[in-house]
Amino acid sequence: MDQYEVLEQIGKGAFGSALLVRHKLEKKKYVLKKIRLARQTDRTRRSAHQEMQLIATVRNPFIVEYKDSWVEKGCYVCIVIGYCEGGDMAEAIKRANGTYFSEEKLCKWLVQLLMALDYLHANHILHRDVKCSNIFIARDQSIRLGDFGLAKILTSDDLASSVVGTPSYMCPELLADIPYGTKSDIWSLGCCIYEMTALRPAFKAFDMQALINKITKSIVSPLPTKYSGAFRGLIKSMLRKSPEHRPSAAQLLKHPQLQPYVLQVQLKSSPTRNILPIHQSLTDKVKKMTFPSDVVDSARRRMARRNSLGNERTVTFSKPSPERNSVSSTRSIKEYTTTQSVKGLSVDSSEAGDEVTSKAIITKTSSILRTPKSLPAKTYTARNQLEPPKTSYNRTYRSELPSKTTPNKIARPARRASLPLSTYETPTKRSISILEQLDSPDVSVNAPRIDRIAEFPLASSEDPLLPIHNKLSPGHGSCSTPPFINRSITKDKCTIQVLRTDGDNGSDSSGRNATAASSRGSNDSRQQRFDTSSFQQRAEALEGLLEFSAQLLQQERYEELGILLKPFGPEKASPRETAIWLTKSFKETAS
């Protein structure tokens, strides 16, 4: 604190204050955010420290600049961030006094905000409080996204469930107690752009119930006709009720309406700054220049590298397809990730899922038989190498977390047919104990304005939002499942949990729970999910594994047998659950 001179207080909230300070040596102005720890709950104090750690790791030209942070006398968490002379967007809307912003300026601002969100989402970070008062304007009229007090880090396919944020910017799925993902930030950004365009809030009511009704029905007034139809349609697409129908940040950056402004932002940004990739349709000549020339035979090299290195993840680039045109930055190859369009599968599309999962299980079994000595290395692979990529948005360049996707389409071996599957696959082998390492901690930072964690009943829904990573409660025989998840997952997970906790007596109750859950689906969807031929293939794969184990036992090759059966021990949850599920599926088919 001795390095800074306090100039004035520029803001005050429920948990602290914001001070305008000047660095004594640099003579540059910054904002000092002081979060009070005294007389606060343990969660508030923990969240303040988590916010300090999170904002220190974020680096993007369109996110507020991080300068320094410390804990002052155990009473305050102090965070020093860049100062934006233009104030926040809420103040700018008031200063406009009814004068509309130009469409060009709004498009530039939207592109910058989308790049900031795309960077966060690519690093599995939900902002959860995108609103006009958290959007700041720099001296050069560029945008900075700030205030990570409610941000949350997601692990793998995990979803958030805490009802936090500002009510008028909350998405319908959040208000409906449905777990939400990155599309919730897209909704909030849509509300902001609507407010910046119409100079009035997208959703406004006299009481909370009326506000919730408007949001859940997505009732908004028409935008001013001053703006083009394409721009107005772009804003409306961000405010679609179903999160599956909402575009991701990466998809919005590809919108023809934003392409000219995306290129402008790319050219103005310094090449050394960590910005996101710009999706731009260019000539084949330019596209060839942006990729290494030594990757002509990239597919063959990937296969050789995968067989030789096991679980080590290496990103290799190939020439982009027409639907994945992009301009890459000049960073090192290790920081690259592949930008690709992902088509989500609905819950009922289980035929493709059955086929892909069957091939995955067979491939996994055969790889174990070929290279049993590589199993211990897989078991102790680092966590950051095991996180499967999200399928709700296109991959983007990022520096904080390594990428795990390539354009090739190969089956993901750790997925079951009942889970929503992506239309691509990763070229690396996954650890057998992946489910154990993907528990997502509650990293919600700062005490929320509205905070309650709901338990979600089993119910049917039209569309899935994201692939779900379910957590099992160690003390209960049934699990809480989002309404739109495939019910075959619920049946499987609950049965496994009861076998662990209650032994034989729990199998009856789990069967009843599974029957109740599965009976809610239609007969057609049930027949489609439980495909007889698919379960037969899984059973044959398991039978082949058992036969090979018996052969090793007869030949007294105990060391290799131990390596082969090690993943199925009591400490290895994922393969054990898989084996139980396969056996149960085969018994149901036979009966």
Curated annotation (Swiss-Prot):
Expressed in anthers, pistils and leaves. InterPro entries: Kinase-like_dom_sf, NEK_Ser/Thr_kinase, Prot_kinase_dom, Protein_kinase_ATP_BS, Ser/Thr_kinase_AS. PROSITE patterns: PROTEIN_KINASE_ATP, PROTEIN_KINASE_DOM, PROTEIN_KINASE_ST. Disulfide bonds: none annotated. It is an enzyme of class 2 (transferase). SMART domains: S_TKc. GO terms for molecular function: ATP binding; protein serine kinase activity; protein serine/threonine kinase activity. Residues 309-331, 382-408, 500-534 are annotated as: Disordered. Keywords: ATP-binding, Kinase, Nucleotide-binding, Serine/threonine-protein kinase, Transferase. Transmembrane segments: none annotated. The active site is at D129 (proton acceptor). Residues 4-258 form the Protein kinase domain. It comes from the Eukaryota. It catalyses: L-seryl-[protein] + ATP = O-phospho-L-seryl-[protein] + ADP + H(+); L-threonyl-[protein] + ATP = O-phospho-L-threonyl-[protein] + ADP + H(+). It holds the Pfam family Pkinase. Its EC number is 2.7.11.1. Belongs to the protein kinase superfamily. NEK Ser/Thr protein kinase family. NIMA subfamily. May be involved in plant development processes. This is Serine/threonine-protein kinase Nek2.
